[in-house]
């Protein structure tokens, strides 16, 4: 064979391999479609809906918690670092993003200092998401006494597992204070969304019995990475009520059947009767979710969706997202592109009653492939606060109109369709 034939054969082989890989992942997604036949509406039958939420999440709604919503790096990082510096017994930290920069160095120092004063510090770092992390930071923490492990490094003999990441963001201090949300340990999350280099995100601080669920999610990833079981009393201290907010943990792990993240999202959409406010950085709904959102709008629910605009770190995901917009807009759903910077939040507010916050993206990867964590917070006050933040974000956004979609042209729409076909691997 001539060199050109070898080259052509290699190209064809690569294309076939890519097709098989995407098809396998797409089939996984197809097995995770949610079609909610019926669910108690949130408003008129709230207690019944909470029981349904329990069934969807696979966790009870836990009473007696204190919850604080933290917007952007200016609020989340001082709170997290303050908790680390005040720690006394344990720090458990799991993150998908840990890059280079000033804030990663500050966290490495704070965690190292904690370990040196006798605190047990454990970190689970996703091996894909932390690819930009300088190894000197990991070495610094290990030398100080921190236990650091990487989740699912690439292994040629088990390469399909590499497709399943831990996307969870969890910080648990002394087993009593927990943080979760969309944050990453990178300078992009610093500030207050004031410029393109400072991203927009939403996170929560939790105290009370619900923190045990965060600890459990961390120990799950730790066990997968190290085969160690964390059962010490220091890891699971006695937790007493500290507030009056009910919270349900959404601990989502890839499985055969719909994941907890997908089930809860489907329940919130199906149960809504008045309003739905969705902020999501990677909004690529499956066909069944497009049906569910359109059905919600058709029955009178006021649906608004906030997505990134000109600043997006995953342009192919943005194209896939845009493929879903025509039908949603046709059914009266408001879609808004955030203009100032990358919008990285992952929140849902349903009927002004329930707020969902966490790492869960509205895409097949979060629903079928990644380990995720979120909390469904039952609080009108916190829901109202988040809606006010959403409305402030809309003022800095541009609404997607039918004319906007039509102006994209055939070539752009064709590329959007191709990206949507490959959505399971974006």
List where the protein language model places each region:
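Charged, low-complexity intrinsically disordered terminal segments
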Residues: 2-426
């Amino acid at each position: 064979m001539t060199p050109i034939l070898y080259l052509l054969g290699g190209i064809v082989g690569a294309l076939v391999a890519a097709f098989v890989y995407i098809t396998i992942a797409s089939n996984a997604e197809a097995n995770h479609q949610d079609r909610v036949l019926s669910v108690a509406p949130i408003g008129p039958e709230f207690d019944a809906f909470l029981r349904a939420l329990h069934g969807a999440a696979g966790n009870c709604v836990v009473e007696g918690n204190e919850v604080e919503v933290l917007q952007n790096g200016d609020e989340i990082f001082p709170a997290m670092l303050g908790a680390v510096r005040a720690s006394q017994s344990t720090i458990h930290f799991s993150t998908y993003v840990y890059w280079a920069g000033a804030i990663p160095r500050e966290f490495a120092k704070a965690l190292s200092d904690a370990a040196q004063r006798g605190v047990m510090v454990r970190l689970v770092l996703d091996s894909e998401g932390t690819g930009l992390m300088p190894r000197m930071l990991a070495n610094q923490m290990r030398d100080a006494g921190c236990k650091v492990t990487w989740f699912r490094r690439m292994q040629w003999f088990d390469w399909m597992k590499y497709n399943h990441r831990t996307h969870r963001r969890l910080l648990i201090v002394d087993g009593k204070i927990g943080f979760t949300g969309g944050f990453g340990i990178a300078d992009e999350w610093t500030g207050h969304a004031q410029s393109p280099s400072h991203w927009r995100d939403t996170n929560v601080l939790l105290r009370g019995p619900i923190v045990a669920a965060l600890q459990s999610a961390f120990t799950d990833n730790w066990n997968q990475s190290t085969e160690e079981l964390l059962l010490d009393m220091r890891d699971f201290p006695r937790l007493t009520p500290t507030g009056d907010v009910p919270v349900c943990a959404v601990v989502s792990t890839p499985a055969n059947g719909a994941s907890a993240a997908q089930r809860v999202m489907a329940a919130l959409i199906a149960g809504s009767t008045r309003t739905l406010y969705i902020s999501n950085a990677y909004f690529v709904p499956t066909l069944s979710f497009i049906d569910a959102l359109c059905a919600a709008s058709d029955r009178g629910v006021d649906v608004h969706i906030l997505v990134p605009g000109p600043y997006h770190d995953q342009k192919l995901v943005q194209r896939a997202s845009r493929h879903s917009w025509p039908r949603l807009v046709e059914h009266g759903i408001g879609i808004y592109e955030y203009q100032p910077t990358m919008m990285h939040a992952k929140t849902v507010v349903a009927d002004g009653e329930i707020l969902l916050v966490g790492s869960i993206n509205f895409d097949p990867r979060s629903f079928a492939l990644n380990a995720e964590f979120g909390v469904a917070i039952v609080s009108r006050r916190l829901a109202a606060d988040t809606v006010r933040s959403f409305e402030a974000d809309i003022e800095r956004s541009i609404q997607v109109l039918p004319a906007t979609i039509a102006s994209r042209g055939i070539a752009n729409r064709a590329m959007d369709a191709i990206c949507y076909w490959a959505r399971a691997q974006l």
